[in-house]
Amino acid sequence: MLVCDADEKNANDKRKMMLDNMGKETDYIFDEDKMTMLFYGRKEVEVYTYIFPDNDGSGNLENLLIDTAKIVYPQLLDFAEEYVGKAATIQTTLMREQDKNKAIVGCITNVMKPGKANQVSIADNDWVSERTIEESEILRRLNQEITKMCRLV
């Protein structure tokens, strides 16, 4: 499964760019029509893609996390947005929306897991839970794609 952020591109443009680059490797042959890769001329596997935040628009993982934070950490989200908004007036690296989103998520995760990476907080806290999968359309779409990829349906 190819998973990456769309960033400023939309998901289809990012997917096309990533898949075009896949065809340049020498160890496998990528068949875009079948969405399969043939490794060393022997093993054919399906290729799945998911482009954050929602497999459709622009953005990144942090857009998805902010969506789930609205559900499980609304007060921390409000504080983080206020802090990052004020910091953006003096820190020019926070001018782009995606950079602000990364900073907002970083603030929340560092409150819950001081000094730990976002991945640790995602694993240990409630960003992804039955509740957020049920209430967040973005997360529900990701869950459906992973379920389909793993052939659990």
Language-model features, listed with the residues they occupy:
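Small/polar/charged residue-enriched interaction surfaces, especially the RNA/DNA-contacting tracks
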Residues: 3-5, 20, 137, 144
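Glycine-centered secondary-structure boundary/capping sites
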Residues: 23-27, 119, 151
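Acidic beta-strand-to-loop metal/phosphate-binding motif
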Residues: 1-11
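Activity-critical C-terminal alpha-helical subdomain
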Residues: 9-110
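Short helix/strand-capping connector loops at secondary-structure junctions
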Residues: 110-130
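Charge-dense, extended regions
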Residues: 124-153
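Intrinsically disordered or highly flexible coil/loop and linker segments, enriched in small
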Residues: 74-78, 114-118, 148-152
